[in-house]
Amino acid sequence: MRYYQKLVSLLVLVLAASFGVGGCVLLYSDFAVQRGRMATANAAAHAQTCTLLQTEILDLQRRGTTMDDAALTARVEARDTPAALWRGDTLICATLPGLENFSLENAATVTVRTEESVYAVYASDLQGGLRLVTAYDLTGLYRDRDAALTRFLLLEAAVLAAAAAVT
């Protein structure tokens, strides 16, 4: 192999590596921005769900309706959001399998990965010793990130293969 071919090969390799690292950094920074936006939106949705449920409970109590576990379960199940309701350490209801395992503290936020899905789980205390735990599906966000990274790496491999064929 001639000197200029070695030099060109080395240059292509260095450029490919730098573009590869730069592309991955861009993909992950974009993912971080999207994840932050989702976290903000999910936190707002959780706060709204807490406010609406608390308002319903207070309204029913004001009318003299007793809020037993069945009434609370009906209120939680009426929501479109997967949720679990706790009274102290006692689970009242859970609308998503697995949420009964998350007796989180007030204002806690965790990201949970199951075999098939990724969820952002939020917890907040309500009046009367109740704690509402809600879950928001992030599976699509993580799936899109993985697909973009796969496409990028395949493109990077194709560029390296083309460069190898040319040199």
Language-model features: locations:
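Membrane-interface helix-start motif
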Residues: Y136-E156
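Juxtamembrane membrane-water interface segments immediately C-terminal to a transmembrane helix
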Residues: Y28-I57, A148-R151
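Membrane-proximal, non-catalytic sensory/regulatory domains of signal-transducing membrane proteins
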Residues: L96-R131
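Extreme N-terminal signal-anchor transmembrane helix of membrane signaling/transducer proteins, especially
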Residues: Y3-S29, A157, A161-A162
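Inter-domain helical "communication" segments and dimerization helices
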Residues: A83, P97-N106, L138-T139, L149
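Juxtamembrane loop-transmembrane helix junctions in multi-pass integral membrane proteins
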Residues: R2-K6, D144-A147
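Extracytoplasmic/periplasmic helical hairpin
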Residues: T49-L99
